Amino acid sequence: MNKKKDDCGGLSLPSDSVFCSLHANDSIWQHDKKVLRGGKASRDGLEAERIAAQALEADGWQILGRRLRTSAGEIDILAEMDGLLAIVEVKYRPTLSEAAHALGPRQRKRLIAAASYVLAQHPEYGTEGVRFDVIVVDMAGQVRRITDAFRLDEEGWP
C-alpha cells in the first residue's frame, strides 16, 4: 500500500485516505473540494463540526483531525488529551434529543472500523485509551457531549 505524507501535521497515511481538513497553527486546509459542495444539510453539518471542535478545544482537547476519510469509514473529529484518544461523531438535528438518537449500529461499526484503521497507522495515538464520543448540536447551536457513547466490548474491533 502506497503511503503519502500529508502536509497537515506531517501525518503519513495510506494513499486511499484523505484528511479533508486538519487544524495546524490555527489554519484549516481543505483537501477534498467535495466538502465545499452540497446543500444546506452539508453546510449545517460542517458548522456543527466546527462548533464541536471549538467546544473540545475549549475543554483542553487537541484536535488531531477533522473529517478523516479512510477506506473503512469517516471520523468527524479525532481529538486527544493526555494520551486519551476520542473518536468523535458529530450529529446535527433540529433538537438535541433527535440528534442524540441518530447513531445506529451500522454507523457505530463503520466508526469502529475507521478508528481501527487510524490506530493501525498511528499506534502513538491513544496511549492512555480510546473512547467513542458523540457530540450533538441543535439548530440553536446548543452542544451536548455524550462521552463514552458506546464501548468496544459492546461492538468489538473489526
From Swiss-Prot:
Coiled-coil region: none
Pfam families: UPF0102
GO molecular function terms noted in the UniProt entry: nucleic acid binding
InterPro entries: Restrct_endonuc-II-like (IPR011335), tRNA_endonuc-like_dom_sf (IPR011856), UPF0102_YraN-like (IPR003509)
Family label: Belongs to the UPF0102 family.
Protein name (database record): UPF0102 protein GbCGDNIH1_0975
